Amino acid sequence: MSRAHHQQGGAPSQRMLRVAELIRHTLSDLLSRSIVNDPVLEGHVITVPDVRMSPDLKLATAFVMPLGGKDINSVIEALDRHKKFLRSEIAQRIHLRFAPDIRFKADESFDYGDKIDALLASPQVRRDLDATHTETQKAAD
């Protein structure tokens, strides 16, 4: 069995991480240069914070977010319409045995970060943090 078979449930390999970063960088470059002619994409600045590769390197999941977070569904639909073009451009710029199929998903890490910030700002957590801080100061004295 190959090493990739063992890593399906575990952490990504160095090769997966390296290829994902190359694809992320190339995709960001393509979207920032407005190479794709689509009115929806031209009206947005799109960030690509993360790309994840399958163990066989044949599938890339690109997490995208338009600046401001508005119209995410229309942006993903537009990217899906131009998936073949983007795949061919990536294949020309990155020399791999196979050009990976690309899936686009909304990046929800910003929403998750906002939820964590809201939890940390809640009165119950503030009270607990203040109590812990007071106890730490008393122990230090």
Curated annotation (Swiss-Prot):
Signal peptide residue numbers: none
GO cellular component term, pick one: cytosol
Keywords of this entry: Cytoplasm, Ribosome biogenesis
Highest taxon above the source species: Bacteria
Entry's transmembrane regions: none
Claim: Cytoplasm is one of the keywords in the record: yes
Disulfide bond sites: none
Protein name: Ribosome-binding factor A
Organism: Beijerinckia indica subsp. indica (strain ATCC 9039 / DSM 1715 / NCIMB 8712)
Lineage of the organism: Bacteria, Pseudomonadati, Pseudomonadota, Alphaproteobacteria, Hyphomicrobiales
Gene, per the UniProt record: rbfA
